Regions:
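Bacterial Sec-dependent N-terminal signal peptides
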Residues: 1-23
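A general lysine-centric signal
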Residues: 2-3, 93, 329, 571
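Residue-level detector of alpha-helix boundary/anchor positions
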Residues: 6-9, 84, 131, 247
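Hydrophobic transmembrane-helix microenvironments that flank and shape a buried ionizable site
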Residues: 12, 87-90, 256
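Catalytic loop of the DD-peptidase/beta-lactamase superfamily, centered on the K-T-G motif
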Residues: 20-67, 201-205, 209, 241-502, ...
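Active-site-proximal loop and beta-strand segments within enzyme catalytic domains
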Residues: 24-34, 42, 47, 62, ...
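Surface-exposed patches in mature extracellular/periplasmic domains of secreted proteins
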Residues: 52-55, 131, 158-159, 218, ...
Length: 572
C-alpha cells in the first residue's frame, strides 16, 4: 500500500517536473510564475483529493498555458494529458449557442420568432413533447428563451418537482431564469430542422473541423478509445464511462482541454461569429436573483450577486468583474466538474476541467490564486473543501464496529481510512473524513459524526447530524460464543509470535493449567476465548479480535490482531 501511495504522489507531481518554466497573465493583468501556479494547483488537488484536473489559460486571445494534472483513471494509475478526452457535460450548451448565432447571422433564424413556426407540425405532436398539449404557452417559446433558460421548463423532466417525470411549464416563457436542458434540447430540434442536418454534422462543419478540434464530438468516436478519462467520485473511486451514441446539444459532447481552449480562443478572436453577435450572445438577457443555480426552479432570492449584476446571456452566464464584463459556462455531473470564464476586454480566459467530484471544491481558491478572479461560487454550488485532520490507524481503529439505533451503520478501517456503510439508507461504503480526533464528516452528503466515549475511554456511541436531523447510534458490543479447542490441537498454537514491524515485541501463546493463554508481558497473561479454530479474542478485552493464519498443511504460521489498527505477529 505504501508503495502505491508513493507512486500516486509521484505521478501527480511529475506533471510539475515536466512543465516548462514560464509566466502567464492573470485576469487582473498581473503575471504569475508557472512553477508557483503549478505548486498551488497540486497542493489544492492533494488537500481536496481532486483526482484529475486540466487547465488552460488564454492570454492575448490565444491559448498560452494548457496543462493536465492527475489521473484519467486512478484505478489503472493512468495519467491525464492535454489530448485526454473528457466528458464535456454542459459545456456542450455554450458551443451549441454559437452554432445558433451562426444561423441568426445567416438570416435563417430569428431569436424572437416563436420556434414552432420553424417546425412542420405543432410542438405537442412530437412524441417527446406531447406533455405540453394541454398548455398553449408552447406557442410563446423563442430561441432567445431557450438559450437564456427562461422557457419555464424544469432542468430535465425527470427533475420535475412534482415527481411525475412530465415536461411542463412552471412559469410563462420569459418571466424569469431557471436553468433548463429541456429548452436546449427543444432548440436542437429546431436547428436540425432549419439546417436539414443532424447536430453532429453541423458541429463538424461549422466549428470542429474549422478549428481543428479533432478530438471533439457530440457522439462517441472510435478514435477516443486510445485516450479518455473516466469520472471519479468523492472517494476517488472510478465511475463507469458513458459513451454516448445520440447527439445532445445540452450535454453529450466529448472534448479535450486543448480542443475546447481553441474554441474559447476563436470566440474571443471573432473567428466563429462577428463581434456584434458575440456581444449580443454575451449580454444580459435576464437577471439572476436566486441564492443557488440548482435546483433550477428554486425561488429563494438573495442580493449577494447584485454587485456583479449576475445574469444570463444566450447560452452563457454573464457578470461584471473589476476587469470588464465576463461570460462563463459550467459543466457538471457525477464525477465531472468544469468551469470557463472569458473577459474580452482583457483578451483573457481560463478553462478548468476536472474528472473528479471533488474538483469544484477547489475552484474558488484556485481562481483567486492563479487567475486573480472572484466568481459567484456560492450560487454555483462550488462549496470549498474542508481541511481534514491527520489521524493514525491506532486512533481510527477505536471507531471500527457496528452501530445501532434509528439507523444501522457499519464502520471499518480500510487503506488507512475509516469507511461507513448503512443498509438502512442504502448507503454504500464511503469515506469518513476527520475534523479532529473524534469528529468526522461525509462528502457525499452534509452529515457529521461525533464519537462519544465512556468513562473507561472506549467508544460507546456516535451522534449523527444529518443536515440538522439528529440521530444517536450505540456501538454494538458483540456477544462472544465460546468454542472448545481440543487439547490435542494445543501444540499448533503454542510458541512465540513477533510483531512483523518490530521483531523485538513478542507475544507468547502458552498452555497454563489446561487453558491456552497469551503472555503479553512479564506481568500480563490473558486467556484466549475461541469462536472457532482460527478466530478468538483476549478474555476481558472487548475491542481486540485475533485470527490465526494457517499454511496449506493446517499449521499456524502467524496471527493477526485487530485493535486500534491491524497488526501481524509471525510465529517463530
Amino acid at each position: 500500500m505504501k508503495k502505491i501511495v508513493l507512486l500516486v504522489t509521484g505521478c501527480l507531481f511529475l506533471q510539475v517536473i515536466q512543465a516548462q518554466p514560464k509566466q502567464f497573465q492573470k485576469a487582473d493583468g498581473k503575471k504569475i510564475d508557472t512553477k508557483l501556479a503549478e505548486t498551488q494547483i497540486t497542493e489544492l488537488m492533494q488537500q481536496a483529493e481532486v483526482t484529475g484536473l486540466s487547465i488552460a489559460v488564454i492570454n492575448d486571445n490565444k491559448p498560452l498555458y494548457v496543462k493536465a494534472f492527475g489521473f484519467k483513471n486512478k484505478g489503472q494509475i493512468a495519467m491525464n494529458d492535454t489530448s485526454t478526452c473528457f466528458y464535456g457535460a454542459s459545456l456542450s450548451k455554450s458551443l451549441f449557442a454559437v452554432m445558433v448565432m451562426q444561423l441568426v447571422e445567416a438570416g435563417k433564424l430569428n431569436l424572437d420568432k416563436p420556434i414552432y413556426t420553424y417546425l412542420p407540425k405543432p410542438i405537442p405532436e412530437y412524441d417527446d413533447y406531447k406533455d405540453l398539449s394541454g398548455d398553449s404557452r408552447w406557442k410563446l417559446i423563442t430561441a432567445r428563451h431557450c438559450l437564456a433558460h427562461t422557457t419555464g421548463f424544469p432542468n430535465w423532466r425527470q427533475f420535475n418537482p412534482k415527481e411525475n417525470n412530465k415536461l411542463e411549464f412552471f412559469f410563462t416563457p420569459g418571466e424569469r431564469y431557471a436553468y433548463s436542458g429541456e429548452g436546449i434540447a427543444l432548440l436542437q430540434l429546431v436547428v436540425e430542422t432549419i439546417s436539414g442536418k443532424p447536430l453532429e454534422t453541423l458541429a463538424q462543419e461549422k466549428i470542429f473541423r474549422p478549428l481543428d478540434m479533432v478530438r471533439t464530438s457530440y457522439l462517441w468516436q472510435p478514435q477516443f478509445e486510445n485516450n479518455f478519462a473516466v469520472g471519479h467520485d468523492f472517494n476517488e473511486e472510478t465511475l463507469d464511462k458513458s459513451k454516448r451514441t445520440k447527439a445532445n446539444a445540452a450535454g453529450s459532447m466529448e472534448t479535450t482541454i486543448a480542443d475546447y481552449s481553441k474554441f474559447l480562443s476563436a470566440l474571443l478572436r471573432g473567428k466563429l461569429i462577428s463581434d456584434k453577435s458575440r456581444k449580443e450572445m454575451t449580454s444580459k438577457q435576464i437577471g439572476i436573483y436566486t441564492k443557488h443555480q440548482f435546483p433550477s426552479l428554486n425561488t429563494d432570492t438573495t442580493s449577494a450577486n447584485f454587485g456583479i449584476e449576475l445574469g444570463y446571456g444566450l447560452g452563457w452566464g454573464v457578470m461584471k468583474t473589476p476587469y470588464g464584463p465576463a461570460y462563463f459556462k459550467e459543466g457538471h455531473t457525477d464525477g465531472w466538474g468544469h468551469y470557463c470564464v472569458s473577459i474580452p476586454e482583457k483578451k483573457w480566459a481560463i478553462l478548468l476541467m476536472s474528472n473528479s467530484s471533488n474538483g469544484e471544491s477547489i475552484y474558488k481558491e484556485l481562481l483567486e490564486k492563479i487567475a486573480g478572479l472572484s466568481i459567484p461560487w456560492e450560487w454555483e454550488g462550488y462549496i470549498p473543501f474542508r481541511q481534514t485532520a491527520k489521524l493514525s490507524e491506532d486512533v481510527l481503529g477505536q471507531y471500527v464496529g457496528e452501530y445501532d439505533g434509528k439507523l444501522k451503520a457499519t464502520i471499518i478501517l480500510e487503506d488507512g481510512k475509516l469507511k461507513v456503510s448503512s443498509k438502512t439508507v442504502n448507503m454504500p461504503k464511503t469515506n469518513l473524513y476527520p475534523i479532529n480526533d473524534h469528529r468526522f464528516f461525509l462528502k457525499i452528503m452534509e452529515t457529521e459524526l461525533d464519537f462519544i466515549k465512556g468513562v473507561d475511554g472506549k467508544v460507546t456511541k456516535v451522534l449523527l447530524d444529518d443536515e440538522g436531523e439528529k440521530y444517536e447510534l450505540k456501538k454494538v458490543v458483540p456477544k462472544v460464543e465460546t468454542f472448545v479447542i481440543p487439547k490435542s490441537a494445543y501444540p499448533n498454537y503454542l510458541g512465540n509470535y513477533v510483531l512483523s514491524t518490530d521483531p523485538k515485541r513478542k507475544i507468547s501463546i502458552q498452555n497454563f493449567k489446561g487453558v491456552l493463554v497469551a503472555k503479553l508481558s512479564a506481568t500480563e497473561t490473558v486467556p484466549l476465548i475461541f469462536m472457532n479454530f482460527t478466530q478468538c479474542s483476549f478474555k476481558g478485552v472487548k475491542d481486540a479480535q485475533i485470527e490465526f493464519i494457517l499454511d496449506g498443511k493446517g499449521k499456524v504460521i502467524k496471527m493477526k490482531v485487530q485493535q486500534n489498527g491491524l497488526f501481524e505477529w509471525i510465529k517463530q
